[in-house]
Amino acid sequence: MTKNKGLIIILSSPSGAGKSSLAKALLEIDHNLRLSISATTRKPRPNEQDGVNYYFKTKVEFEKLVKQNQFLEHAKIYDNYYGTPKKHVENLLNQGLDVLFDIDWQGARSIKQNAVNAVSIFILPPNLEVLEQRLRNRAADNEEAIQLRMASAQAEISHSNEYDHIITNDDFNDTIQQIHTIILQERKKRN
């Protein structure tokens, strides 16, 4: 009996809506999930490790990988490049593991156009005031960066209708359960 290929599960949201925390929690409760690790040209945040959180690349290195067609998708966001390396994802899917993507709407659109086994979930903040407070509380960005993220949040949210599912993250544990239920249902459909 051949093993089924894994699913691609896409989580997207405006910056600060909780998708990275949700992804981490999902990985802890579902042992068939693996996180897709993106490459980026942005500087590492405190406690981020190369090859664990991201593959940190220079702009020249990143552009070389683009020319070599090494990404499933790539985009420029907030003056930095982000992309999903193909090889690692393909290896996981071929093992029957599900791959969780923590990416923006541009990457989600690109993957959905090219993958038949993808399910997309958009995470909304309860409102924009809560979103701004979350960005300020994480203290990772200066005021200019926070304002840039808030300005782009509306544009990001405007693409939520392109997703298979939309969930408002007003209760973290409830949101985890909603996402996990979607994943379990998608597995049943495909098996």
From Swiss-Prot:
Cell membrane keyword on record: no
Superkingdom in the source lineage: Bacteria
Substrates-to-products reaction catalysed: GMP + ATP = GDP + ADP
Gene behind this protein: gmk
InterPro entries per UniProt: GK/Ca_channel_bsu, Guanylate_kin-like_dom, Guanylate_kinase, Guanylate_kinase_CS, P-loop_NTPase
Family named by the database record: Belongs to the guanylate kinase family.
Described purpose of this protein according to its UniProt entry: Essential for recycling GMP and indirectly, cGMP.
Originating organism: Rickettsia bellii (strain RML369-C)
Keywords, in A-Z order: ATP-binding, Cytoplasm, Kinase, Nucleotide-binding, Transferase
Xref: HAMAP family: Guanylate_kinase
Protein name: Guanylate kinase
Binding, ATP: 13-20
